[in-house]
Each structure stands twice: as structure tokens, then as C-alpha cells.
Amino acid sequence: MSSSRRSRTSSRLAAAPPPTDEQMAELISKLQAVLPTRGGEANAKQASSAEVLQEACRYIRRLHREADALSERLAELLLLQPSDLAINGADVPDLIRSLLM
């Protein structure tokens, strides 16, 4: 990153006032709303901000693991020969490539 871009970014960040407690509570509430709940646990009690952030981090890590596993599986499928796998006569690796483009 160039020094002029860095200074513009840092000056913009320095000029922004910190979020209010109300804004933070609203952001935490929005974050909690998009996290998967476990058996209504979120409805049973109001989670603290720290708990919501920890759950968000766990969820993001889980999504990364799932994305990695899917990426590995996709790579395996793309390495298959056309004769190895076909769906309704369509070559699966070619089908996957066309979907990715």
C-alpha cells in the first residue's frame, strides 16, 4: 500500500468517532441474529457481547473448515477423467468448470 493511501486511510479512521454503546449493542444484536442458534439457547437468555463474538469466531472458523473441505472435494472431482463420472451423460469435471466460469 502506498504511503499516501495509508495516510488517507489512517486519517479517516482517526477522524471517525468511536461507536456509541447503543451502536455497539445494535451491531452485536445484528451479529447474533445471523448466527445459527443451538436449540433455542439464544432465546433462553440474552448472551453477553463477548459470548456473541466468541460464537461468531467459532462459526467463522467452522465455515472456513467447511469451505476448505469443499474446495478439496471440488479439486478431486475436477481431476476425474470424463469416463470416471458422468451425470445424465454430462461430464462432471466439464460441468463443474462451466459453473465456475
UniProtKB/Swiss-Prot annotation:
It holds the Pfam family bHLH_ILI. The gene is ILI2. GO terms for molecular function: protein dimerization activity. Residues 1-22 are annotated as: Disordered. Transmembrane segments: none annotated. Keywords: Growth regulation, Transcription, Transcription regulation. One of its GO terms (biological process) is regulation of DNA-templated transcription. It comes from Oryza sativa subsp. indica. This is Transcription factor ILI2. Residues 8-63 form the bHLH domain. Atypical and probable non DNA-binding bHLH transcription factor that integrates multiple signaling pathways to regulate cell elongation and plant development. Belongs to the bHLH protein family. It comes from the Eukaryota.
